[in-house]
Amino acid sequence: KLTSLNTFAEKYESAKSSISEDIVIIKRAFEEIEIGHIQTVTGAGGGVIFTPSISSHDAKEMVEDLRAKLSESDRILPGGYIYLSDLLSTPAILKNIGRIIAKSFMDQKIDAVMTVATKGVPLANAVANVLNVPFVIVRRDLKITEGSTVSVNYVSGSSGDRIEKMFLSKRSLKAGSRVLIVDDFLKGGGTVNGMISLLREFDSELAGVAV
């Protein structure tokens, strides 16, 4: 969210020049202790945008905690899969994962976060919320409520033995967008490759992939 200098000047009854000096100091302090990034937008309609972050120390502790949870023997499912639903449905854990992923892409000028329905949606939403950008949902089945869509075929399955189709509403993504793909699961990479193909159809650019 962009907050204008006028807002600060009126609230604290200070000159905008003084506010600007304070922002420089605060920006430096926030980056030093790794709690967030302050972006300054110049011009008549300018102001500042604060993007929260997480310190390297806190991120490491959270990752270790997640690793311990994921290592629990009762999480192993038939086929070698790992049960994740309880973690991805816990708001505090989901928020922290979103902050950790977003931290790695904070300087990448992300315009949107993309995921595929349905289990990747909460995670993508958490990342998009920290980056303060929209998130778009790719679907494997066509829904009339999506309006006009763009579709691509992609190879599904670790053995590459199935051809499936995915859809994205034409209104979901602007041409030229830099997009971060986020998903909760990776097997053969077919779904991610399908989303990358969709980005090409929208003349958009892949900024990164986080799984």
Briefly describe each language-model feature range.
Residues 4, 8-12:
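Short alpha-helical "recognition helix" segments of helix-turn-helix
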Residues 12, 22, 27, 32, ...:
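PRPP/pyrophosphate-binding module of the type I phosphoribosyltransferase fold
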Residues 17-18:
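Key DNA-contact positions within bacterial/archaeal DNA-binding proteins
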Residues 36-51:
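Minor-groove-contacting beta-hairpin "wing" of winged helix-turn-helix DNA-binding domains
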Residues 110-117:
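Short glycine-rich phosphate-binding loop at a beta-alpha junction
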Residues 133-179:
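Short, glycine/charge-rich flexible loops or terminal/linker lids adjacent to PRPP-binding catalytic cores
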